[in-house]
Regions:
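N-terminal leader/targeting segments and the immediately adjacent pre-domain N-terminus
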Residues: 20-125, 153, 182, 396-408
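Catalytic-site signature segments of enzymes, centered on catalytic residues
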Residues: 120, 126-127, 194-276, 283
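Active-site Gly/Thr loop motif
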Residues: 266-269, 317-373
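Active-site helix/loop module of the DD-peptidase/beta-lactamase fold
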Residues: 131, 150-188, 220, 245-282, ...
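Active-site-proximal alpha-helical segments within enzyme catalytic domains
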Residues: 141, 235-242, 281-304, 362-378
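Structured C-terminal helix/loop/strand segments within mature extracytoplasmic catalytic/sensor domains
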Residues: 23-37, 42, 353-408
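Active-site SXXK
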Residues: 113, 131-156, 180, 239-243, ...
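Bacterial N-terminal signal peptides
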Residues: 9-17
Length: 408
């Protein structure tokens, strides 16, 4: 038996022997202490404060607020919940089985703008604002598309330094915006979430100095830009600085009247800000589960709300359709599974399906043809879940739901 199957079998066995109503690893995640909230120094790595911190991040870190819509988009519930099942490791499972197996804090399934299923675990509720982690990168991409349409950015083939003069002479500044969107600057950057990687180094400099200084700590390019996908969160920070330069305002203030309110958010969102006043950008956007669902609906409708086009459609297609990507960025090429667009992950398969993904299991999966959205927030054991049972079962769940309404 393969190691992954052994892990899954053990996980399922543990789930079956848990007390009725118990969530996976709830004791490790702090149930006895009421799922405590961490501090700036430990919230990202400390398992014992993970659930609390991931749903209360803005209670202890400085942030911007994106105010809710005056008239929220109605999210009607289905008259009765359909039986949603999926096949995994030669077994058939339900939504509730998925929650019993995995450290899911919240889950939504939406079809044609209608809420089919909604679940919460670990005492989380519909009022909690869940952290996006790197799903925020896709939101930054949407802002780039809007700024391009408003002619605040002349061309995606312009270099970043044309707009962010402080990055002149630095490889990030001399990279085309399009290549930054594709995580293809060619600048080496190690991101493994162990506290000692380049990502940690970058964040430490950013916390004590500023974003420009942190970016200048990476002064060399090793691969020709635009030729190779290499995931690096600091490239989204480059886009965040670019947006501040061209809009003259915070990213949150820019997006509130252009995205958050027009899409019909029912609650305020928050975005953690850094020492220099810019949003984290690459992560730390916080919203209630249903508003993440509304974002998914917007994307499933190709950026439109009714007759109003919120996100430029052609930009969104460029961002999310693997057929529009160079060969190196297509599924099974950028990574062994996903392709990569403009800060979006692209599923393999002939049809256009894409994802917003964040560490520890945060996910929004979108199928525009089926108008189908799956939202998952989580507190997975490890930051990188790609090769773990969590990711494999999550993919099986998505494929199972897609298969009930269409075909892969």
């Amino acid at each position: 038996m393969q190691p992954g199957r052994i892990l899954l079998s053990c996980a399922v066995l543990v789930a079956l022997t848990l007390p009725a109503g118990a969530a996976p690893d709830e004791d490790l995640l702090g149930k006895a202490a009421g799922y405590p909230i961490g501090k700036a120094a430990n919230w990202f790595f400390d398992e014992g404060v993970r659930v609390g911190s991931f749903s209360r991040l803005d209670s202890f870190l400085p942030h911007y607020i994106l105010r809710k819509a005056a008239a929220p988009l109605t999210l009607p519930k289905a008259a009765s919940e359909p039986k949603l099942t999926y096949r995994f490791e030669k077994q058939t499972y339900s939504l509730d089985d998925f929650l019993a197996h995995q450290r899911v804090t919240g889950l939504l399934v939406i079809k044609d703008g209608q809420l089919l299923a909604e679940r919460y675990q670990y005492d989380r509720t519909a009022a909690d604002r869940f952290v996006s982690h790197s799903m925020a990168k896709s939101i930054v991409s949407l802002a780039i598309g809007m700024a391009l349409t408003e002619n605040k950015i002349a061309s995606l083939d312009d270099t970043v330094a044309k707009y962010v003069r402080d990055l002149a002479g630095n490889p990030y500044g001399e990279t085309a915006i399009r290549n930054i969107l594709r995580m293809a600057s060619g600048v080496p950057f190690n991101e493994v979430y162990d506290g000692n990687d380049d990502s940690s180094k970058f964040n430490r400099i950013r916390l004590t100095r500023d974003s420009i200084t942190a970016l200048r700590a990476f002064p060399t390019r090793e691969v020709e830009q635009g030729t190779q996908f290499h995931y690096a969160s600091n490239q989204t920070v480059v886009l965040t600085l670019l947006l501040r330069a061209v809009t003259g305002t915070s990213l949150s203030d820019y997006l509130t009247p252009r995205l958050w309110q027009p899409m019909g958010a029912e609650a305020d969102a928050t975005w953690i800000k850094t020492r220099d006043g810019t949003e984290t950008g690459s992560g730390n956007f916080n919203a209630i589960l249903r508003d993440f669902g509304r974002l998914g609906i917007l994307l499933a409708n190709d950026g439109a709300v009714g007759d109003r086009q919120i996100v430029p459609k052609d930009y969104l297609l460029d961002a999310t359709d693997w057929h529009r990507q160079p060969d190196a960025f297509k599924p099974n090429k950028a990574t062994p599974y996903f392709g990569y667009g403009y800060q979006f992950w692209l599923f393999p398969g002939e049809k256009r399906r894409f994802a917003l993904l964040g560490v520890y299991g945060q996910s929004i999966f979108v199928d525009p043809e089926l108008k189908l959205v799956l939202v998952i927030t989580a507190a997975a054991k490890n930051a990188s879940v790609g090769k773990e049972p969590f990711a494999r079962e999550r993919d099986a769940l998505w494929r199972g739901i897609v298969g009930q309404y269409g075909s892969w």
